[in-house]
Amino acid sequence: MATAAASSLLKSSFAGSRLPAATRTTPASLVVATGPRGAGAGPICASMSMSSSNPPYDLTSFRFSPIKESIVSREMTRRYMTDMITYADTDVVIVGAGSAGLSCAYELSKDPAVSIAIVEQSVSPGGGAWLGGQLFSAMVVRKPAHLFLDELGVAYDEAEDYVVIKHAALFTSTVMSLLLARPNVKLFNAVAVEDLIVRGGRVGGVVTNWALVSMNHDTQSCMDPNVMEAKVVVSSCGHDGPFGATGVKRLQDIGMISAVPGMKALDMNTAEDEIVRLTREVVPGMIVTGMEVAEIDGAPRMGPTFGAMMISGQKAAHLALKALGRPNAVDGTMSPPLREELMIAYKDDEVVDA
């Protein structure tokens, strides 16, 4: 039992104060097997060893370093307020941190000259991508979107036309951890977008508030919002619901688009292609991606497949880069160029004019 438990461990940072020499041990290296990336592939091995220079903690006399409670408060407050000042006027605001929004932010963040703010009303970003369909664990991704998983390093089981991630949370946690480590990205979770900034017929940012405040406007008064200006807004608010498709619904309310017909009945084969193809700048300054595309165009719903969310998000990122005058896959200025398998999503004749 101990051997089986040990073999499931990956390299750990659980090390610190030196143990007395009499009690110190140096365990043997451990071999770890992870799931195969594709069918027929062998296990991926990693090793872990504890050297004498990096011994385990002495848990018999363990103590944290001292700290004043006020320091904790000041560190959190100072950093958050600094972020609010920094991103009050930014290059791109992404509204919604589901699979499309996170994929968009990840692709955008590869350009270090572009600053990105992600606004997510939930405390927990990820939208519906923590699980597959009907609260099941596995995530199905149709090819060629598996190339994005290869880039992220997410393992999967491979079939001829699709791949399966054993738990959807593997994708979401991986893309999120890689994305948020980049210096040009800030996630503002538990923050809701209540409205858009519009000047001269162009979207120029978002109106924000704490999510809990937005949910209680009927019970409290005088809870005015804040604002974030942006050169480009990417709306990835998902399909219809209390917090769904809010971007395009607001565009209809203020007369910038004529209608939001909503999704048609489920048709996976049509839906995923349509969502990628129709990802575009719907009004000046605002790009729509993910399931919100189906809401504005009346495309079929796609059900529990996620490839279109990833590729639609990436396409939205390159549309935003084009709007910013940065190298991108839409006009062919990106180097190296996009993989040939994904180019169909960016062909000029496949992009609907805004």
From Swiss-Prot:
Paired cysteines (S-S): none
KW Transferase (keyword) present: yes
Q: Where is the signal peptide?
A: none
The cross-references to Gene3D superfamilies, in alphabetical order and at most eight, read: 6.10.250.2840, FAD/NAD(P)-binding domain
Record's cofactor remark: Binds 1 Fe cation per subunit.
Q: Where in the cell is it found?
A: Plastid, Chloroplast
Pfam families, from UniProt?
Thi4
Q: What is its EC number?
A: 2.4.2.60
Its family remark reads: Belongs to the THI4 family.
Report the function annotation for this chain.
Involved in biosynthesis of the thiamine precursor thiazole. Catalyzes the conversion of NAD and glycine to adenosine diphosphate 5-(2-hydroxyethyl)-4-methylthiazole-2-carboxylic acid (ADT), an adenylated thiazole intermediate. The reaction includes an iron-dependent sulfide transfer from a conserved cysteine residue of the protein to a thiazole intermediate. The enzyme can only undergo a single turnover, which suggests it is a suicide enzyme. May have additional roles in adaptation to various stress conditions and in DNA damage tolerance.
Stated name of the protein:
Thiamine thiazole synthase 1, chloroplastic
Q: Which organism is it from?
A: Zea mays
Q: Give me the gene this protein comes from.
A: THI1-1
